[in-house]
Amino acid sequence: MNKAEQLVKLLIEKKYTVSFAESCTGGKMAARIVDVPDASKVLNASIVTYANEAKMKYANVSKDTLKQYGAVSENTAREMAEGVAKANNADVAAGISGIAGPTGGTEDKPVGMVCFGFYIDGKVFSDTK
């Protein structure tokens, strides 16, 4: 059983729905879930918010957060996750933003850096890889 299958199984068991707000992954997270049988029981919504304007409009990321921390930050990823969860009444959500490359990286935010925001049952947390 792959990770997507494990996630769908767990979400079904808990009777949770999931939504995604993706940037650098371009919808690949949701696509993995859709490939799993019974995904329709758990996948609520998925949006690709590549541009900052889309992050603000569809994932409720504040302009101030983008200005202060940038599109690739844990703050932005958290707001993406919370925004897409609340907009779609999801129990669980993920916000993903990063530097896909091959250019665009900096010393502080190198190519390959990805920030993850998670919303689970009203709690929000994040991580960077």
Regions picked out by a protein language model, each given a short descriptive name:
Residues 1-129:
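Short alpha-helical segments enriched in small residues
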